[in-house]
Amino acid sequence: MRRFDKSYAEAKRKIDNGDIGKVVLVRSYTQDPRSTIESTLKFAPHSGGQYLDMCVHDIDLIRWFTGSDVKNVWAIGGVFEFDLYKELNDADNAAATIQMENGAMGFMFTNRTLCRRLQR
């Protein structure tokens, strides 16, 4: 769970202390590098789909940071590179806009086609 990572815990502390104001939008990007695609494709039939496999942590953070539950979700995705995802009714790139019960918003982008590893 990402909420136990020091940087996310610090952001939550700042939210709770009122240091950064009211949270109206939480934006998240979860991307798998193309260099790990072999193992990702092997796991894909058992993963439950990109949102369940990758975005469960993003959804948790959006709920945690906004202090609210999800009211509505609009999602779109596509297969742009790896045809196996078509067979699984999944996507290799997907995005979702989330409306929270308290009016806050969330935006998630996820993909399995990142050209290089992200610097941390």
Give residue ranges: language-model regions.
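Predominantly a Rossmann-like dinucleotide-binding segment in NAD(P)-dependent oxidoreductases
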Residues: 2-88
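Broad gene-expression machinery/nucleic-acid interaction feature
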Residues: 25, 93-95
